[in-house]
From Swiss-Prot:
<feature type="compositionally biased region" description="Pro residues">
    <location>
        <begin position="575"/>
        <end position="588"/>
    </location>
</feature>
<dbReference type="InterPro" id="IPR050234">
    <property type="entry name" value="Nuclear_hormone_rcpt_NR1"/>
</dbReference>
<dbReference type="InterPro" id="IPR035500">
    <property type="entry name" value="NHR-like_dom_sf"/>
</dbReference>
<dbReference type="Pfam" id="PF00105">
    <property type="entry name" value="zf-C4"/>
</dbReference>
<dbReference type="InterPro" id="IPR001728">
    <property type="entry name" value="ThyrH_rcpt"/>
</dbReference>
<feature type="zinc finger region" description="NR C4-type">
    <location>
        <begin position="82"/>
        <end position="106"/>
    </location>
</feature>
<feature type="region of interest" description="Disordered">
    <location>
        <begin position="466"/>
        <end position="528"/>
    </location>
</feature>
<keyword id="KW-0862">Zinc</keyword>
<dbReference type="InterPro" id="IPR001723">
    <property type="entry name" value="Nuclear_hrmn_rcpt"/>
</dbReference>
<dbReference type="Pfam" id="PF00104">
    <property type="entry name" value="Hormone_recep"/>
</dbReference>
<comment type="function">
    <text>Implicated in the regulation of ecdysone-triggered gene hierarchies. Probably plays a key role in mediating the regulation of the larval molt by 20-OH-ecdysone.</text>
</comment>
<dbReference type="GO" id="GO:0005634">
    <property type="term" value="C:nucleus"/>
</dbReference>
<keyword id="KW-0238">DNA-binding</keyword>
<keyword id="KW-0675">Receptor</keyword>
<feature type="region of interest" description="Disordered">
    <location>
        <begin position="679"/>
        <end position="699"/>
    </location>
</feature>
<feature type="DNA-binding region" description="Nuclear receptor">
    <location>
        <begin position="42"/>
        <end position="118"/>
    </location>
</feature>
<keyword id="KW-0539">Nucleus</keyword>
């Protein structure tokens, strides 16, 4: 039945097409893949396999599955769980038996409530559906043609034999000519690895060997592609078959290169390789012996080119390879190829009916050799990578050793061991590492001059390679001296100043003077930047040194110092002080009678501290009340006792005035200005002696 899709058809409900360009490659890449099942030219339902009526809820489905899914999501029906492990097959004839598994399959194939589309069917969607249908019909036609070709045994036999002859270079006639030429003019190769077909990689480059062997491997891959039915397999199945059977087919093709009577192998480049010359490391002797034994067994059968081609096809197309998906098609191809081989053997060897079984019995041994060869190849790759890594490390260590040795001789903070080696020149070698390894390091004799010809021209020959080292100007390092601190002061002169020699001069110092005489004059441009700056004249004017500028006070401390200095100058001036009404006894410690020293006081250097000390004592209200009580008792005592008998006045700590509270004298200033007494940083005024308090209270 033909499916007709017209713009007015009720084939689904779709969104309007977007304005995106359909022909753009980016749009083609972003288009989702269509999951469409066909029965000839009819689109089938993704759920039950019935004829699809349109695109419903995101998939192509029939009317029955569309209605079932709509009822389930609209009414939110909870179906009874399946009693058959939830794996019921949903078909057209039994889709109503298990509703639970039917809804589960609807969701699994992609049906969704949000996938409903409205509008007409887009032209792009129609084109995609038609293309998928055409591709499906084309692939089905190819499968039918391949099936017909597999069923046609003579045609299959002819195609396989022709493919073998076109892709294999080592047929019986060609190998016979190579063997005759090798026996007449034998050219033996050097000892090589355990791989039987490795043509002396020590004498030829790896690139040449890879190119020569890659051509043979490519022939096996092309041969597999020409086998009827191989192109119908998926890419994964093709890769699985080639990966597991490539060495087997390659070994069957090259089995005629082994010469068992002479215990030799004809390599791909035509050279002969003796069996004893193969290296037997890493248990390779067992692999070599097994390979020669299997080759002798296969060569004794005298297979023809047609039999070898069919046997190679059977080795490649094997249904028991792990990872195959389309096992049925592979098994079908294997059966047809085996039947063709039986036909050829029956024609060539009618007297040996069991020859096919004998040939098929070699397959387990062939797979064993393939496994051994793969293991040996893995070991070889690991050892080869490790060897290359060690060579790279050794080269890097050699280069770093040469560089570190040159740097250590050029600038060693400890100095050399002997004085004779300290004056040698360290030159940069511009030759490759090979020249440095072959020539070694040359040292100059410090007691004599260096031969210019020996330094300038030095040729090194190795395997026809001539290396000429490039001469570079030698570098001299400064010798260690007991008085050398390692820091340049910037006052050194470019010209060497000759002075009187030291009485305890050593050979080292003489060598140093000799080297300094030979040192070329250094221009100002070659000097370090710091050295040029230190030798330049100062940029600021005046005689003050750089340290004075560095330790100059901040501007806020300068202003405060200026204010305190003026106040101190006014205080230092000698002014007549008025005599009090009640003169006290002479007290040299009183600030009013003791002249200030003419030198700079502490206030000039500690302005903030002096200001805080010159302020009056700050007392709490309780202390002020207590002071008033004491002053009242003192006034009462003045009327009864003479002024000279007052112990407080005699102590010079308090001065009482009539009719007013006494003003405190600058006792703190006295304590600050006295040079002999220690500096008192307390802001509180000293309390009167406790011995006078009872007398004051009694008065």
């Amino acid at each position: 039945m033909t499916l007709v899709m017209s713009p007015d058809s009720s084939y689904g409900r779709y969104d309007a097409p977007t304005p995106t360009d359909v022909t753009s490659p980016v749009h083609r890449e972003r288009e989702p893949e269509l999951h469409i099942e066909f029965d000839g030219t009819t689109v089938l339902c993704r759920v039950c396999g019935d004829k699809a009526s349109g695109f419903h809820y995101g998939v192509h489905s029939c009317e029955g599955c569309k209605g079932f899914f709509r009822r389930s999501i609209q009414q939110k029906i909870q179906y009874r769980p399946c009693t058959k492990n939830q794996q019921c097959s949903i078909l057209r004839i039994n889709r109503n038996r298990c509703q639970y598994c039917r809804l589960k399959k609807c969701i699994a194939v992609g049906m969704s409530r949000d996938a409903v589309r409205f509008g007409r069917v887009p032209k792009r969607e129609k084109a995609r559906i038609l293309a998928a249908m055409q591709q499906s019909s084309t692939s089905r036609a190819h499968e039918q043609a391949a099936a017909a070709e597999l069923d046609d045994a003579p045609r299959l036999l002819a195609r396989v034999v022709r493919a073998h002859l076109d892709t294999c270079e080592f047929t019986r006639d060609r190998v016979a000519a190579m063997r005759a030429r090798a026996r007449d003019c034998p050219t033996y190769s050097q000892p090589t690895l355990a791989c039987p077909l490795n043509p002396a990689p020590e004498l030829q480059s790896e690139k040449e060997f890879s190119q020569r062997f890659a051509h043979v491997i490519r022939g096996v891959i092309d041969f597999a592609g020409l086998i009827p039915g191989f192109q119908l397999l998926t890419q994964d199945d093709k890769f699985t078959l080639l990966k597991s059977g490539l060495f087997d087919a390659l070994f069957v093709r090259l089995i005629c290169m082994f010469d068992a009577p002479l215990n030799s192998i004809i390599c791909l480049n035509g050279q002969l390789m003796k069996r004893d010359s193969i290296q037997s490391g890493a248990n390779a002797r067992f692999l070599v012996d097994s390979t020669f034994k299997f080759a002798e067994r296969m060569n004794s059968m005298n297979l023809t080119d047609a039999e070898i081609g069919l046997f190679c096809a059977i080795v490649l197309i094997t249904p028991d390879r792990p990872g195959l998906r389309n096992v049925e098609l592979v098994e079908r191809m294997h059966t047809r190829l085996k039947a063709c081989l039986q036909t050829v053997i029956a024609q060539n060897r009618p007297d040996r009916p069991g020859f096919l079984r004998e040939l098929m019995d070699t397959l387990p041994d062939l797979r064993t050799l393939s496994t051994l060869h793969t293991e040996k190849l893995v070991v070889f790759r690991t050892e080869h990578k490790e060897l290359l890594r060690q060579q790279m490390w050794s080269e890097e260590e050699a280069v770093s050793w040469v560089d570190s040795g040159a740097d250590e001789l050029a600038r060693s903070p400890i100095g050399s061991v002997s004085s004779s080696e300290s004056g040698e020149a360290v030159g940069d070698c511009g030759t490759p590492l090979l020249a440095a390894t072959l020539a070694g390091r040359r040292r100059l004799d410090s007691r004599g001059s260096v031969d210019e010809e020996a330094l300038g021209v030095a040729h090194l020959a190795h395997n026809g390679l001539t290396v000429t080292p490039v001469r570079q100007p030698p570098r001299y390092r400064k010798l260690d001296s007991p008085t050398d601190s390692g820091i340049e002061s910037g006052n050194e002169k470019h010209e060497r100043i000759v002075g009187t020699g030291s009485g305890c001069s050593s050979p080292r110092s003489s060598l140093e003077e000799h080297n300094e005489d030979r040192r070329p004059p250094v221009s100002a441009d070659d000097m370090p930047v710091l050295k040029r700056v230190l030798q330049a004249p100062p940029l600021y004017g005046g005689t003050p040194s750089l340290m004075d500028e560095a330790y100059r006070r901040h501007k806020k401390f300068r202003a405060l110092r200026r204010d305190t200095g003026e106040a101190e100058a006014r205080t230092v001036r000698p002014t007549p002080s008025p005599q009090p009404q009640h003169p006290h006894p002479a007290n040299p410690a009183h600030p009013a009678h003791s002249p200030r020293p003419q030198r700079a006081s502490l206030s000039s250097t500690h302005s903030v501290l002096a200001k805080s000390l010159m302020e009056g004592p700050r007392m709490t209200p309780e202390q002020l009340k207590r002071t008033d009580i004491i002053q009242q008792y003192m006034r009462r005592g003045e009327s009864s006792a003479p002024a000279e008998g007052c112990p407080l006045r005699a102590g010079g700590l308090l001065t009482c005035y009539r009719g007013a509270s006494p003003a405190p004298q600058p006792v703190l200033a006295l304590q600050v200005d006295v040079t002999d007494a220690p500096l008192n940083l307390s802001k509180k005024s000293p309390s009167p002696p406790r011995t006078y308090m009872p007398q004051m209270l009694e008065a």
